[in-house]
Design a protein with these regions (language model features):
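C-terminal catalytic "cap/lid" subdomain
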Residues: 1-277
């Protein structure tokens, strides 16, 4: 099977112009078919402040009210995405900027508010309990526009996705970029040998959060459960690893987690970052 790379970058790259330029220069040289999924970084908050749109968070998650969904659609789908596209085009990488609404590529449903009931034990244990995050989308993975994605990839386009989906009724939805990346990776794994790469601010998954060099080179499910039992993983990394194992269980060959530039410099070997397999 032909190789496909699905790479996700977050705020540590998006918010740093020099880091983003360096990343895109390396990314543009990758010969394999590739998809880039980017987060929004702090730019939406900065522009929101300038426009008088307050940013609200609950449990570290952005609340996407009516004003905010308009803001992030403009910033993520417009400013951030198109600056990435323009840079890649300048590097002779024929990229196309997309959201989940384009060609109905990534349909989603608005996340409902969950309230406790006497027979809803799952809800009672959830940190999302009784909280309305607004216009946030949960991806409908069964309805991905796979045929359109494959046509774009087969015509040598590099796909660059903003973290936005839609509900099919005209409403844009703010959606977790990690989830978009893993959903695309799984959906395309029947046609391609997919490697999913999560880039973030550390060199990999750390055994000791105080030691930036304590990178765990390989995490299997057995190792993962052991690390959780020993309380060695910080909360922020758990959703990434959960997404990684979900992707592997559903057809993705392997997942790498680590620093963006380190991973791209060593894209053909697995000695950098953390391999989830």
């Amino acid at each position: 099977m032909e190789q496909l790379l699905v790479i996700k970058i977050g705020g540590n790259v998006i918010d740093n112009a020099a880091a983003l330029q360096s990343f895109l220069e390396k990314f543009s040289t990758i010969k394999a078919r590739k998809i880039l999924v980017h987060g929004g970084g702090k730019i939406a908050t900065k522009i929101g402040d300038q426009l008088g749109i307050q940013s609200n968070y609950i449990n570290g998650r952005r609340v996407t009210d009516a004003a905010t969904i308009d803001l992030v659609t403009m910033v993520y789908g417009g400013l951030v995405n198109k600056k990435i596209i323009a840079t890649l085009q300048s590097l002779q990488c024929n990229a196309i900027g997309l959201t989940g609404a384009d060609a109905n590529l990534i349909p989603a449903t608005q996340r409902p508010v969950v309230y406790p009931t006497s027979n809803n034990e799952a809800a009672a244990g959830s940190d999302l309990l009784g909280i309305d995050y607004g216009f946030v989308g949960d991806v409908d993975s069964a309805s991905l526009g796979l045929q359109s994605l494959e046509i774009l990839l087969s015509n040598n386009f590099t796909l660059v996705f903003a973290p936005l989906t839609h509900d099919g009724n005209g409403q844009m939805l703010n959606t977790n970029a990690d989830t978009i990346a893993s959903t695309l990776a799984v959906g395309l794994s029947k046609k391609y040998a997919v490697r999913l790469i999560y880039c973030f601010e550390k060199k990999g998954v750390l055994e000791n959060v105080e030691d930036p060099n304590s990178v765990i080179s390989l995490i299997t499910k057995e190792k993962y459960h052991q690390l959780i039992a020993e309380n060695k993983l910080f909360d922020g990394i758990l959703p990434k690893i959960d997404n990684a194992f979900d992707a592997i269980d559903n057809g993705v060959n392997e997942v790498l987690i680590g620093d963006a530039n380190d991973l791209l410099q060593n894209i053909t070997i697995n000695t950098i970052g953390t391999l989830i397999k």
